[in-house]
Amino acid sequence: MELLHYTGISIVKNAPVEKNSAFKVLNRISHTRETFFKTPFEVINIPKPNNSAYTAHALRNHMDLPWFENPPGYQFLHCLINSAKGWNSSAIDAFAVADYLRKNEEKIFDILVNTPLKFRDKDYTQEAVRSFYGSAISLTKDGDYNDIRYSIATLDALDCHPDKMDSVYKALHRFGNLLHDAKFQINFRLEPCDIFSFNNRRLLHGRTEFDPNSGHRHLQGYYMDRDEIIGRLNYLKKIKP
């Protein structure tokens, strides 16, 4: 749990492989967060998907639910089956990318911190349109990194002054390229019994495409608020200093 909190990523090995069994692991931390996807949500290839995750297509590195005012702090993807060719996972520490820009490309960094972006989702299964404005990089009062809000698939039309449009586009393009740069990204393959655990507002995740005729891939996903992880860590430190 400390690894997850301080680095933004961990992979639990040798978890149970039965459906819904990740509850046994996660409930040792705290309760999960419910969303309209339900809990757990099934990451499988389906005929009429309401989200690109439910296809065999590749996904660019992204965070989940950026159109929420308060996106889930942590996500857990429990691998039940992964026998298909392809569909390898990727992860990138967006805080490290932001820090690179802060130190080397300050103008782009400032644009990403100070420009509200609109993220939008239209879900036919819920008969709902959700949207929220937030900057790609947000900082704490002390200037540390608080959140990354980025998903090119759900980024709506830019809503900024025409004079700033070109510079904002260029900043987003640069940020998007770095969020797929090999020097920041790791690639791996999830195996059955793995729980890929990560900070949804720091670590962006993606995957390669797969051939649905070559086998199956089934993940179950869970969310948890950041407060639950931090609260449990604070408690454990208090009783076990």
Show where each model-derived region lies.
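Active-site environment of non-heme Fe oxygenases that use a 2-His-1-carboxylate facial triad
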Residues: M1-P241
